[in-house]
Amino acid sequence: MFRRTYFWLMLLPLFMVGCTGLPDHPTSVEWQSHQAKLSQIQSFQAVGKLGYISPDQRQNLNFYWKHSPEQSNLRFTTFLGQTALNLTMTPQGARVETYDDQILTAANATALVQQLTGLVIPVEQLSDWIIGLPNGADDFQLNEQNTLSSLEKDLNFQRWHIAYTQYRDVEFHQQVVPLPAKLSLTQQDIKLNIVVSKWTLK
C-alpha cells in the first residue's frame, strides 16, 4: 500500500504541471470472415489514451502498446510525456519498469500492475480484446456491421463488460479490416475508457 501510494504521490506533480477459444455463439458468414482476418494479426502497435475511473482514483494516461507473440510491451505516459509505467509481458511472466527505475516481476501482469499502481486493468486479455477478438469471453454480441459490439467475461469472480462504440478501417495485408477506435471496460464501479488513435498491423 505504501509503495502504491508513494508511486502516485510522486507522479502527482507531473499531472498537475501538464489462446483460449471463442465461446459458442450464433455467427454470420461476415463475422466468420472478419474473425479470420483478426486471427491473422500476429503483431500490432496501438497508440492512444486511457481514462481510468474508480472510487479511489482517476487517471488520464497516454499509452503505446507493441504486441507480438513473443513479447508485449505496454507503456503509459503522462500528458507531458513522462513514462509512468513500462510493462513487458512474455510467456515466462511480467516485468514492470517504473519512472524511478524500479523493476518488479511477477507471473501475472494484471496483479503486478494493480500491486504497483492500484489500477485494475485486465492487460493479459486486452491483447485480444483491443483488436475486437473475443477470445476467452463468456458471451459476446455483434453489431450490424458484424464486428464486436460487446463482450462479457468473469475474471477472478468479477464480471467485466466491454463495449465497442467506434471502429476505424485499418490496412492489413493489402485489404482493409475494421479495428476498435473507442471501447470501454466496466467492472462494478471501475471504468476504463480507451481511445486508439493509431493502429499499425503486421
Curated annotation (Swiss-Prot):
HAMAP family: LolB. The keyword Ribonucleoprotein does not apply. Belongs to the LolB family. PROSITE patterns: PROKAR_LIPOPROTEIN. A lipid is attached at C19 (S-diacylglycerol cysteine). Monomer. Keywords: Cell outer membrane, Chaperone, Lipoprotein, Membrane, Palmitate, Protein transport, Signal, Transport. Pfam families: LolB. Plays a critical role in the incorporation of lipoproteins in the outer membrane after they are released by the LolA protein. One of its GO terms (biological process) is protein transport. GO terms for cellular component: cell outer membrane. This is Outer-membrane lipoprotein LolB. A lipid is attached at C19 (N-palmitoyl cysteine). It comes from Vibrio vulnificus (strain YJ016). It is found in: Cell outer membrane. It is a lipid-anchor. It comes from the Bacteria. Residues 1-18 form the signal peptide.
